[in-house]
Every structure is written in C-alpha cells, then in structure tokens.
Amino acid sequence: MKSLGIVIPSFNELESLRVLVPTCINLLTENPNLQIVIVDNGSNDGTNLYLEMYSDIERFKYLILEANQGYGGGILAGLNQLETEYLSWTHADLQTDIFDIFKFDLNSLPDYFLAKGIRRGRSVSDYIFTFGMTFYILLKFRRFCNDINGQPTIISRKLFYQFNYPPSDFSFDLYAFIMAKKMNSLIIRKKIHFSDRRYSHSKWNFGFTSKINLIIRTLKFSNSLKRYLND
C-alpha cells in the first residue's frame, strides 16, 4: 500500500483523545508508511497540553490552532501537514473506529479516487436528514452523493491538488465529494458502524434547529459551488 496520512480534527475532545492517541501510536508502530496528524482546532479543555506529551513520536504530528477554524478549516490545516500519497480524515469523537480506514482496499487505485464510509446505526431522523440532502444534491449537481458526511474519507493526493479554496465549515465534505465527481474519480463506498458518543457532545447537532441551520448553510454553499463548476 502507498503511504497514507490520517488527519483527526478535534475540538474539546480531550477524553476521546485519551483513548484514541494510544491507538494511533500502536498503528504507527505497525504501519511504517502511515502518518497521523491530530488538529487541536481551538480547544480550551487542555488538549494542547495532552498532545505535547507525544511530541517525540515519529510520524505523529499535532497542530495547535489557537482559534477554531471551522470543521473544514481544521481538516485542511491537517491535510497540508501530510507528506503521504493518500490522505484521509476522520473524527476524534470515537463514533467511528480509526481501524475503519483500513477496511478499504487501497491497492492498485487510479490517480483520482475518493473512498468514504456510509454510516450505519444512526437514528431515523438522521437517516431522513441524510436522504433529503442526498436528493437535493442529486437535483442540484446531477451527481449522486449519498451520505456526504460519512466517515472516514480517503482521497488521492492528485485529487487534493484540485481543491481550490474549499469551505471552512461542514460543507467541506460536500466540496470534496463534488470535486471527486468532477474529476471522474473512482468512488469507493463501504458500510461503517456509527456509534453513540462516549464523551462530550456534538458541537453542531443539538436537534432540529441545528439541522435546519446546517441545511441553510449547505444550500448557500451549494449555490456558490454550482457557479464555480460552471465557470
């Protein structure tokens, strides 16, 4: 397998990181072609102090952002730190297992590809929300993009080089998916179990109102992305 980099953005996820980081260290020991970057995206729970304990681990990086740069901004900052041929991102909240990345067959892939999990085990309301967004994107872009925010996501470096001013919010996943479709990339999907949070709480999903706000932001961004693709 070619070299793989994993970006894990976090915002006030210290308790989850206490579980996740030792697992990351073990993965690095077992996989010499692996690099991991954890992005502390403006946390105020002591995440930076915890990550500093691992400053001497080879191929393990941490990036401290003093102010929160948004979901997409944190991921992009981490991706720019990677030196690997394949790049990926997943969340620090433990709702998916970092080992899920290795469920994808990353051998003999073309220059342009996107691999992404399809979340299973979610609530009915979340499934309805995802279906609605999938249907809207299909109508808007004439491209089928199911479960846009599924985890994890893995892309080729050549696809990443096509990213031009991606959004800094939760539209980042939509942008990556649409760019992959635009470049006629191979799309690989795999069902991934999605668990409840062990610690903390979602930083955006507080119920119906937060979903409506996310929909509005996504609709606005999709309009600007549509104009960009038509230029």
Regions found by a protein language model. Give the residues of each.
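Cell-envelope/extracellular polymer assembly enzymes that use nucleotide-activated donors
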Residues: S3-G5, Q35, Y175
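Hydrophobic helical membrane-anchoring modules
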Residues: M1, E15, Y165-D231
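Short, well-formed alpha-helical segments that are part of the catalytic scaffolds
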Residues: E13-L27
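Donor nucleotide-sugar binding loop of glycosyltransferases
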Residues: E13-L17, S43, Y71, D97
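A conserved acidic beta->alpha catalytic loop
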Residues: D40-L49, L94
